[in-house]
């Protein structure tokens, strides 16, 4: 997270983090511009009325919890395999990938679509794509540069 903090300070409002993680730790660590591509475990969505809201109670007092709006059943506000990415997150991430100059791929297998396609979107929009990973993965062909190793050791090489 130290790299993220330094990069965000250096780049200011030009820094955007797109995460596939659903745990909310990037926001808790201080990232101010985060797209939670696969949603957040700290949000709920009603299966009946679609109401969405933050819910940080842990553990939940009742499973499944009732919807405060209609009494229906709530589910975690995350994307399960086979579900569609929320339109807002997908559009925001694609817009950012098309507009960026530098797109970093960090610690992902690149096997989960459509998130894995964002590197190609960035590259086709003339961004430099750099992959930081332990081994080559599903987006390595899109990367202009592949840096092998643990992200905690290799990412700080970008920020002096």
Predicted regions and their residues:
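Conserved catalytic alpha/beta core of Sir2/sirtuin-type deacylases, generalized to analogous enzyme cores
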Residues: 3-160
């Amino acid at each position: 997270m130290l790299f993220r903090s330094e990069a965000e300070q250096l780049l200011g409002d030009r820094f955007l983090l797109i995460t596939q993680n659903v745990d909310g730790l990037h926001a808790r660590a201080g990232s101010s511009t985060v797209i939670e591509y696969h949603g957040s475990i700290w949000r709920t969505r009603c299966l009946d009325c679609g109401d969405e809201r933050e819910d940080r109670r842990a553990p939940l007092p009742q499973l499944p919890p009732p919807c405060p709006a209609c009494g229906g059943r709530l589910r975690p506000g995350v994307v399960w395999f086979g579900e569609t990415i929320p339109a807002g997150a997908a559009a925001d991430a694609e817009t950012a990938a098309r507009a960026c100059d530098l797109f970093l791929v960090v610690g992902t297998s690149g096997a989960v679509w459509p998130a894995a396609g964002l590197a190609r979107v960035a590259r086709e929009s003339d961004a430099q794509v750099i992959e930081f990973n332990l081994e080559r993965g599903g987006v390595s062909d899109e990367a202009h540069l592949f840096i092998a190793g643990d992200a905690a050791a290799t990412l700080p090489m970008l920020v002096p």
